[in-house]
A protein has these predicted regions:
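Core hydrophobic alpha-helical transmembrane segments of single-pass membrane proteins
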Residues: 21-22, 85-86, 124-128
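Transmembrane alpha-helical segments of multi-pass membrane proteins
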Residues: 14-19, 75-92
Length: 155
């Protein structure tokens, strides 16, 4: 039996992306509860801007996270977080414009988000999820085995 090569980078990136999206949505909800504010406070944007922003951010997280996981350096988590933040901000503007909002209102919402607690929440969740994905990709652990599943030469 050959030693385990660890988790494949595409699988680690997939799990990290799902974890990022879940943590970000939870973080936004909890921050909204604590601060009694909306994530996107501009009513003219509707829900489309937030949905678009999260989808764009998750796609960029997956793409940059995959690259960081393949390289295996933990500093890559910072670059993934920076790219994810930029993608979320672009997603707010694009989603707002696609839903029919005035472009000035959409850009204003980007500015409001950029100076809110939600930006910090998004940065931390992206960095933590990217770090976890990199750690998962670097590990050489294998699944647990019963004694009778092991090869005879290992005993």
């Amino acid at each position: 039996m050959s030693p385990s090569a660890g988790v494949a980078p595409p699988i680690a990136a997939f799990f990290a992306t799902i974890g990022f999206a879940a943590l970000a949505i939870f973080g936004f909800g909890f921050t909204s509860l604590l601060t009694d504010t909306d994530v996107l406070a501009e009513p003219a944007l509707g829900q489309g801007a937030g949905i678009t922003a999260m989808l764009v951010a998750a796609l960029v997280f997956a793409a940059t996270g995959y690259g960081a996981i393949r390289r295996g350096r933990y500093v890559g988590a910072l670059w993934v977080a920076a790219a994810t933040l930029a993608a979320y901000l672009v997603g707010i503007a694009a989603g707002g414009i696609l839903t029919g909002a005035d472009p000035a209102v959409a850009v204003g919402a980007v500015g409001d988000f950029a100076v809110s607690w939600y930006l910090l929440v998004l940065a931390v969740t992206a960095a933590v999820a990217a770090w976890a994905g990199i750690a998962l990709g670097r590990t050489r652990a294998s699944r647990p085995q019963w004694p009778w599943e092991r090869a005879d030469d290992e005993e």
